[in-house]
Amino acid sequence: MTLFKVYARALRYLGAYKLRVSLVVVANIVLATITIAEPILFGRIIDAISGKGEVKPILFMWATFAVFNTIAFVLVAREADRLAHGRRATLLTEAFGRIISMPLGWHHQRGTSNALHTLLRACETLFGLWLEFMRNHLSTVIALALLIPTAMSMDLRLSAVLMVLAIAYWLIGRVVMSRTKDGQASVENHYHTVFSHVSDSISNVSVLHSYNRIEAETRALKSFADRLLEAQYPVLDWWAIASALNRMASTIAMMVVLIIGTMLVQAGQLRVGDVIAFIGFANLLIGRLDLMRQFATQIFEARSKLEEFYALEDSVREREEPAGNGEIKDVKGAIEFRDVSFGFGNSSQGLHNVSFSVKAGQTVAIVGPTGAGKTTLVNLLQRVYDAQGGKILVDGTDITKVTRKSLRRHIATVFQDAGLLNRSISDNIRLGREGASEEEMRRAAEAAAAADFIETREDRYDTHVGERGNKLSGGERQRIAIARAILKDAPILVLDEATSALDVETEARVKAAIDNLRQNRTTFIIAHRLSTVREADMVLFLDDGRVVEQGSFDELSHSNGRFAALLRASGILTDEEVRKAHTTEAA
């Protein structure tokens, strides 16, 4: 993407404020016009004084311009700041909404810290571009567009010097940008590495403390920062050279204007005021060209950040759901997988030709070794990912034909990690159903066996749970998560290792709450603790993404298959029980 396209797309975000931006454009035209007029007026005053002419009309005109200049400047300063700040806040909100609504598979592939870093840096970069566009870029472009024709109308010879100076600035900038393009892209990659390392370390700070990794991780960060500087310094060196060359060209141009102007005045071909005006033009041109150089540098440095953000936005729009998808309503909970397959790119993990059906209100236990595809299966049900083959039906409706939002409205999930927000207990429970009353929220807490410990807290339901619920115990966090699911009152329930991280006593309390939650709901239970799946109507044993055994708990436990082997390994079933079961069946 060229610099012009990067900049043009950045400015398109201001399209929502066309009227206000138009006012800023008009004000900048006024500022640029007055900027060009001032050197001419100053030259006329010099001529009037030296020729003993009338000065007052020129001074009055200058004073009038000063009034308009002040008004236009205040308008630009006020509106530019308000527009830039307002658009940044709006963009952050809009982009956040689009990004967070993306399928979890998209987030897993891209990485949370990467998307966050890209969004935040782009918002700040765009804010700077918008502010500079309205404060300086626009007036600079207009001033340059007016300056050259005005100067040429006064004297072509001195105008040629200004033209050569402008071309020199352009050539220097062009060369430097071509030499630093790859270097600046490398700098942005190093910034991402530094940010990801900091984010990763802070989010796992307890592990770093436990394994005495603080100093090692700090050294690693310093190493990443050193590499960043190694990539940054050559870019800075090139721009320093450009500044020196521009300054040299400006000085030479100013000297040439003075020399040629003096010769023309002595020859009687120009007035002193004209030379003064051209000196003002030269100073103005140098100042504006410096602004243009800074402007080009700003866009050049922003290029990699914005290209990544544009790619992020485009990928979000590509993954947005078709506008024609309808809503699924009045779900009873009958679910069918028809020859469903899904894969993770180059990974061998996934699902292969999975088929089964569940009646509304039944409980399905999904078991199998690590990496068998258990979580992938329930993720497909919730459209975290979309199946690459086959169909998933809810009450006979293909879930790819309905919106994710309407589908998930009918599914409540309790994860192994409760996933609490750094808000109050009440706020976390109310995530289950927006607009739930205080009474409904408290009833859900009671049903989840959470009310007792909540009432012992000083602030009760207003107690803040801390980051990811770190002010609560594991059992307390899980009971709040269960209360959230109860409040949602969805016909389909997913329990993803909901009790695996709890001790036996806490698990017993949480299991009672889960049993209450499961009533009259189609339930999927993922569990490594096989004792939790005894009451399942159906057990699916997955291995390598395939359903290798399927049936009731009793059927599979007496089949002497993979599931029975797991039961024996966990001590739930003995070899003697299996032998007796087979003897009974044979008889």
Swiss-Prot record:
Keywords: ATP-binding, Cell inner membrane, Cell membrane, Membrane, Nucleotide-binding, Sugar transport, Translocase, Transmembrane, Transmembrane helix, Transport. CDD domains: ABC_6TM_NdvA_beta-glucan_exporter_like, ABCC_Glucan_exporter_like. Residues 335-569 form the ABC transporter domain. GO terms for cellular component: plasma membrane. It is found in: Cell inner membrane. Residues 21-301 form the ABC transmembrane type-1 domain. It comes from the Bacteria. It is a multi-pass membrane protein. ATP binds at G368, P369, T370, G371, A372, G373, K374, T375. Its main location: membrane. GO terms for molecular function: ABC-type beta-glucan transporter activity; ABC-type oligopeptide transporter activity; ATP binding; ATP hydrolysis activity. It catalyses: [(1->2)-beta-D-glucosyl](n)(in) + ATP + H2O = [(1->2)-beta-D-glucosyl](n)(out) + ADP + phosphate + H(+). It is an enzyme of class 7 (translocase). The chain crosses the membrane at residues 23-43, 57-77, 128-148, 158-178, 248-268, 272-292. It holds the Pfam family ABC_membrane. Homodimer. Belongs to the ABC transporter superfamily. Beta-(1-->2)glucan exporter (TC 3.A.1.108.1) family. Involved in beta-(1-->2)glucan export. Transmembrane domains (TMD) form a pore in the inner membrane and the ATP-binding domain (NBD) is responsible for energy generation. This is Beta-(1-->2)glucan export ATP-binding/permease protein NdvA. It comes from Rhizobium johnstonii (strain DSM 114642 / LMG 32736 / 3841). The lineage of its organism: Bacteria, Pseudomonadati, Pseudomonadota, Alphaproteobacteria, Hyphomicrobiales.
